[in-house]
């Protein structure tokens, strides 16, 4: 700095991750001149920020700080495409979905790769932090060629170290570091933290991975390893069934319905996620299906509850606001590396599931949420500022869409905090077996800030060894829900590269329009992928109006 004072930036505009502030970036050009003649130059983009972590927590779990402020990690695991058949289009789509979901950190799982320069560029722009692991997992303890491995570490760090999104280095997934790695990293980049493997130094082992009763997330019994809604969990997840179009692309019709267990288990890692067993049993709690179309639609309902229950339980226990101290969750995992019946937020073919949109709702920066176990309503704030005199409203509707309960509470939201159990919903004794909950959060001026919607049954939760409970069973009567009348209008806009379809839906009936799915189809009636929906798999209350925008590249319409 003394020799080159132009490198000093006074009062810099800082780079922040999702919800915490803007993603300010600077452009830098460096030139080398000899005798006044430029002989080489390089351009780069960078951001100014500080990310550190420590274990000064009640349970010694790792907690991260960005620009001096504590950061609750709501992240996920990124799995590369199985055959490494990536492209800028695929990278853009998956990172755009990631940003839409609301997560703030992507863990580059140790069984994967270091992604492209374009990947890191987009993470910088989108505010997505990156936890980079180095290509070893539990079944690959050490590289065959240490020198080659160290050379790859060095070249990778040099390539990605200028990106503000790069937050943390980890030597391996559930394995051990190669001797000399910490020293090399410190030499190349002393600005970022490092740990030798993914389950140490304040990050405990993961789970659950498979389908469980959604009630278990609230009860903290979802993992056979004991409490896992606590501390920093690097792998905690649940599956979602793909849409029926994806299932048809994946297997023959004869294997789709009735479900051919052998084929489905093959496409589920030998039945690892229990898609042909427990997932199917939970879907059947919505009533036995007569076709794969009906089954797949009900499967989206379960996938939505899977995701919502996980994220909202971690919201409730954010940092030191809940029943247990929680510093971070990395969902296992959110993108699919290959076609599989245990999908996630989107399928390998880039077709989103209900999980994406219900995760996005759960991770909105100001969020009201319901606890199926406690029957309470809490409000979460992910901004670094407080909000006073907000009002949360809880409404309950029966199967005939009649409002049978309403209560509100005024809440003062602490900066980056939670108001837990702001009110308790008292369900009428004679309420219908299946009913609905609508939550509305209003600001101090009475303007709607966010909303949330749930379906619930009267079934009693009988423990973790059962598939019972108000989030898990007793939903057969959903088939009795009267059909709503929804009017639809749309307009098409375009820019140089994309089409935008603005769809306005209005529920003109007195019935709840339940779990509506929009699809953008080509002339062959096939979904156009990737397309970006601002929302999907949503419900509309009587009289409610909603606008959804669908965006797709113009080149995607060339095939009709």
Where are these regions (language model features)?
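Active-site region of glycoside hydrolase catalytic domains
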Residues: 40, 154-264
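Secreted/periplasmic carbohydrate-active enzymes, especially glycoside hydrolases
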Residues: 1-106, 114, 316, 320-326, ...
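Substrate-binding clefts and catalytic carboxylate motifs of secreted carbohydrate-active enzymes
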Residues: 221-395, 404
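A general structural detector for well-ordered alpha-helical segments in enzyme core domains, enriched
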Residues: 94-97, 119, 149-152, 156, ...
């Amino acid at each position: 700095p003394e020799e080159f004072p132009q490198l000093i930036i006074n009062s810099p505009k800082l780079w922040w991750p999702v919800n915490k502030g803007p993603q300010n970036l600077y452009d830098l050009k460096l030139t080398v001149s000899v005798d006044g003649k430029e002989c080489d130059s390089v351009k780069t983009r960078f951001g100014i920020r500080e990310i550190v972590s420590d274990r000064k927590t009640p349970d010694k779990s790792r907690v991260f700080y960005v620009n001096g402020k504590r950061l609750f990690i709501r992240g996920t695991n990124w799995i590369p495409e199985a055959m490494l058949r990536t492209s800028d289009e695929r990278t853009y789509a998956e990172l755009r979905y990631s940003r839409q979901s609301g997560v703030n950190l992507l863990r580059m799982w140790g069984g994967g790769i270091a992604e492209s320069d374009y990947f890191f560029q987009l993470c910088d722009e989108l505010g997505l932090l990156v936890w980079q692991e180095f290509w070893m997992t539990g079944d690959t303890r050490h590289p065959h060629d240490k020198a080659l491995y160290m050379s790859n570490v060095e070249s990778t760090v040099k390539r990605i170290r200028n990106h503000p999104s790069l937050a943390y280095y980890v030597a391996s997934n559930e394995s051990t570091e190669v001797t000399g790695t910490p020293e090399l990293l410190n030499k190349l980049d002393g600005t970022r933290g490092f740990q030798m493997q993914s389950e140490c130094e304040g990050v405990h082992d993961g789970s659950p991975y498979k389908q469980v009763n959604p009630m278990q997330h609230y009860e903290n019994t979802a993992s056979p390893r004991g409490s896992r809604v606590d501390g920093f969990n690097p792998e905690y997840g649940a599956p979602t069934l793909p849409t029926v179009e994806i299932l048809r692309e994946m297997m023959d019709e004869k294997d789709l319905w009735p479900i051919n267990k052998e084929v489905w288990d093959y496409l589920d890692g030998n039945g690892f996620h229990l898609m042909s067993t427990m997932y199917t049993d939970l879907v059947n709690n919505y009533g036995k299906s007569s076709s794969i179309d009906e089954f797949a639609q009900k499967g989206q309902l379960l996938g939505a509850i899977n995701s919502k229950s996980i994220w909202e339980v971690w919201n409730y226990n954010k940092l030191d606001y809940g029943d247990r101290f929680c510093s971070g969750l990395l969902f296992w995992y959110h993108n699919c590396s290959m076609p599989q019946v245990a999908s996630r937020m989107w399928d390998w073919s880039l077709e989103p599931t209900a999980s994406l949109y219900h995760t996005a709702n759960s991770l909105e920066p100001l969020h009201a949420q319901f606890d199926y176990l406690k029957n309470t309503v809490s409000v979460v704030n992910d901004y670094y500022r407080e909000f006073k005199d907000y009002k949360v409203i809880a409404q309950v509707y029966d199967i005939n869409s009649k409002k049978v309960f309403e209560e509100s509470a005024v809440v003062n939201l602490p900066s980056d905090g939670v108001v837990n159990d702001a009110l308790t919903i008292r369900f009428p004794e004679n309420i219908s077996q299946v009913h609905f909950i609508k939550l509305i959060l209003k600001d101090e001026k009475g303007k709607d800030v966010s909303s949330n919607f749930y379906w619930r049954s009267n079934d009693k939760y009988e423990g973790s060894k059962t598939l019972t409970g108000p989030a898990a069973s007793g939903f057969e009567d959903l088939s009795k829900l009267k059909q709503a009348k929804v009017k639809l209008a749309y307009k098409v806009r375009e820019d140089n590269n994309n089409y935008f379809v603005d769809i306005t839906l209005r529920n003109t009936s007195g019935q709840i329009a339940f779990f509506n799915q929009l699809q953008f189809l080509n002339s062959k009636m096939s979904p156009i992928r990737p397309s970006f929906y601002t929302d999907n798999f949503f419900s509309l209350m009587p009289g409610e109006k909603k606008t959804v925008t669908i965006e797709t590249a113009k080149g995607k319409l060339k095939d009709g």
